[in-house]
From Swiss-Prot:
It comes from Sulfurisphaera tokodaii (strain DSM 16993 / JCM 10545 / NBRC 100140 / 7) (Sulfolobus tokodaii). ATP binds at Q101, H283, M284, S285, D286. GO terms for molecular function: ATP binding; RNA-3'-phosphate cyclase activity. Belongs to the RNA 3'-terminal cyclase family. Type 1 subfamily. It catalyses: a 3'-end 3'-phospho-ribonucleotide-RNA + ATP = a 3'-end 2',3'-cyclophospho-ribonucleotide-RNA + AMP + diphosphate. This is RNA 3'-terminal phosphate cyclase. The active site is at H307 (tele-amp-histidine intermediate). The lineage of its organism: Archaea, Thermoproteota, Thermoprotei, Sulfolobales, Sulfolobaceae.
Length: 339
């Protein structure tokens, strides 16, 4: 059984999520201890338990220690199920995108439909529009096509969001994202839920003005206004579309934060990614690591975070893969077959 120190490195929920995904794919059981030991609320929280429950159901796993506050978990998976219709509720505003990240590799070419309820646009996790604009676009580049439907948005603290994954198809193989090609345009989505539409418009205007002051390319930002949602909130996500890759950013509104600041934050963030010469943005360089390790890929990430470093160490525990990381800002990630 693979033993994992949950307080190692960055020491957050990502260690558990990566372990769950790879345990399911390799059918290797693991024990994780000292879960989130250095965090203000140590142990498993509702968010993490939903990830455990999701992979447990998708693999008929035997699990010990799956309760709130638990600092140790034993996970023994069986084969991934071939078909089914599943629903997972993260509760209030727990992130649906972190659950999606955990289970997505398990769904490839299986007749499985999944509904995830919770927060779609919440702090400390990728927004649903970042996922749709950047993450899924990059997955398509490496041969994985995901059909994702956003049914309702959910913001912190009320949540109430819902997404559906109806199909994940693909034939992923080794990939190289070492060149960007020309920057073609920037696309985005600026949204509000149960708030005046001018907030979304101001976010978009501010982002567009900042970007056009820096680069002369087309900027198209769609306005998404949703009324009568359970939660109130706003946000914006942007993606820079290159000939060979996508770079993304996002920013969320909050009480007392002007819409113009929200828009400018996302614009500044994507501009920094554009001038970094990376082929994959800061968030994506962490998220893509798993896929690069499974299918032998290489890319240039804009910044090597402690999150990403920790992730690479967990991957090595499950996969017999030769991982090479060089540089920091930007950094090159390469995964090759272990000879």
């Amino acid at each position: 059984m693979i033993e994992i120190d949950g307080s190692f490195g960055e020491g957050g929920g990502q260690i558990l999520r990566t372990s769950l995904t790879l345990s399911a794919l390799t059918k290797k059981p693991f024990r994780i201890y000292k879960i989130r030991a250095n965090r203000p609320k140590p142990g498993l929280q509702r968010q993490h338990l939903t990830a455990v429950e999701a992979v447990k159901k998708l693999t008929n796993a035997k699990v010990k220690g799956d309760f709130v506050g638990s600092t140790e978990l034993v996970f023994e998976p069986e084969d991934i199920v071939e078909k089914g219709d599943f629903e997972f509720d993260v509760g209030t505003a727990g992130s649906v995108t972190l659950i999606l990240q955990t289970i997505l590799p398990l769904l490839i070419n299986r007749n499985i439909k999944v509904t995830i309820k919770g927060g779609t646009d919440v702090p400390k996790s990728p927004s649903i529009d970042y996922i749709r604009l950047t993450f899924l676009s990059l997955l398509e580049k490496i041969g994985i096509r995901v059909n994702l439907i956003l049914i309702r948005r959910g913001h912190y603290p009320e949540g109430g969001g819902e997404i559906k994954i109806t199909e994940v198809k693909g034939n992923p193989s080794s990939f190289s994202l070492m060149e960007r090609g020309e920057l073609l345009m920037i696309k985005g989505i600026s949204h509000v839920s149960s708030l005046p539409s001018h907030i979304a418009e101001r976010q978009a205007k501010s982002a567009k003005e900042f970007l056009l002051s820096k680069i002369k390319i087309p900027v198209e930002i769609e306005i998404d206004v949703r009324e009568n949602e359970r939660s109130k909130g706003s946000g914006i996500a942007l993606t820079a579309i290159f000939e060979k890759t996508f770079l993304g950013s996002d920013s969320l509104g909050e009480k007392g934060k002007r819409a113009e600041i929200v828009g400018e934050e996302a614009a500044k963030s994507i501009y920094e990614e554009i001038i970094s010469n990376a082929t994959v943005d800061r968030h994506m360089s962490d998220m893509l690591m798993l896929y690069a390790s499974l299918y032998y890929g290489e890319y240039i990430g804009s910044e090597l975070t402690s999150h990403a470093r920790t992730n690479s160490e967990i991957i090595k525990k499950f996969l017999n893969v030769n991982i090479q990381i060089s540089g920091e800002k930007p950094f090159i990630f390469r995964a090759k077959k272990e000879l």
